[in-house]
Amino acid sequence: MNITNIKTTYGYIGFIPFAFFSLLPWIIGGEPAKTLIIFQLGYGAIIITFLGGFSWGWSDEQINQKFNLSAGILFSLSGCLILLLTYFSKILIALIISIICFYFFYIFEKSSEVFKFKDDDYKKFRKILTLLVCISFLISSWYWINPYSNPYL
């Protein structure tokens, strides 16, 4: 099994909590649904913080490495912002920021010189995984704003 297959397998395993935390609220509803969405935001905040640190491992000879390091810190701080918004019950804002952060991290990673040398399977995997994570946050956002499922607006 080559390294791209291993990364792909682990990446999709890492997606399972996103799917679980976004779909289960539609099934069970009520207070547990709110808790599951909060868990999704917590998990997403951890992941985006972790992803932000990737830029520190990229080659220092890249043209924009100073920018990459700064952007990586901003993505990590956005994870803290998501947690803070969740703590203060600004769930919908945290969900929207999560979508934006994961999408922009993909754009950020795609623009790096490191990404250009990755094989096509990895590039396709990252695109699909980012899309799935963003969709999971959209599903949770729909649950949150649905007046029939959420009394917390």
What positions do the PLM features span?
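Interfacial loop-to-transmembrane junctions
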Residues: S112-C134
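N-terminal membrane topogenic signal
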Residues: M1-G14, R126
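Helix-adjacent hinge/juxtasegments
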Residues: G57-L85
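Hydrophobic, membrane-facing alpha-helical anchors
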Residues: L23-W26, I38-W58
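Juxtamembrane boundary at the C-terminal end of a transmembrane helix
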Residues: I139-L153
